[in-house]
Amino acid sequence: MSRVKRRAWLELGLVLATAVLHFVFQTALHLDAPYIAAAVLFWTGYLVYRLRAAGQARAWGLRSDTFAASLKANGVLLLVAGAAMVGYGLSRGRGCPPPHSLYLLLALYPVWGLIQQFIICAIVGQNLQSVFGSRIRAVAVGAALFGAVHLPNWTLCMLTAIACAIWMSLFLRWPNLWVHGFSHGWLASLAYIYVLGEDPLAAVRQMFNV
């Protein structure tokens, strides 16, 4: 097995461990917020460590030459999906007027969105494409895995699987983590408020009694 394939399997294993631990901390221990913070620190550290290699930043989408194309594609996704989610939520009496937490989510969620896109697209997507030798297989498997992470919430599972398939397809064609981080963060914020009718910051406020 080549060094590239070994690294691909190693990184996919790390992602699988992250997903399993997320399921345990969220469903069994009810410590979702602390786990997310720990996951952000771990993957940020791994990203910084690997960026020492020449050309790695470009390979992972930390680049400017794909910015315009990625922005255009993700902009269309954001407008269409965002409008659909807001329209759905308003028809259900959600988010009118928008809760204050929405603005905080729109400001902060892109940070977590960038980390998730790094894991989903740069790590899982590119490594699956390397392992399978097929973009279609990589997208199908990646979307299924990302959706499964959000079980037992089937609504969130389906939403995230569809979103992952679109994001991964766009990233493998126009890799740009900066654009994908904001796209993920803003769409996820709208999904929580207008589709799921949930406030993901409630757990944080409860943890700190604010």
Task: Enumerate the language-model features and the residues they cover.
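Function-critical hydrophobic alpha-helical transmembrane segments in multi-pass membrane proteins
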Residues: 90, 95-148
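Aromatic-anchored segments of alpha-helical transmembrane domains
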Residues: 16-24, 81-90, 143-152, 185-196
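Membrane-interface helix termini and inter-helical loops of multi-pass transporters
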Residues: 26-28, 57-63, 89-101, 201-208
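Short, aromatic-rich membrane-interface segments at the entry and exit
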Residues: 29-39, 97-102, 154-161
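Structural signal for the C-terminal ends of transmembrane alpha-helices
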Residues: 24, 48-57, 90-91, 170-173
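Membrane-helix interface segments
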Residues: 31, 66-67, 71, 98-102, ...
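Alpha-helical transmembrane segments in multi-pass membrane proteins
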Residues: 2-53, 73
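Functionally important transmembrane alpha-helices
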Residues: 157-210
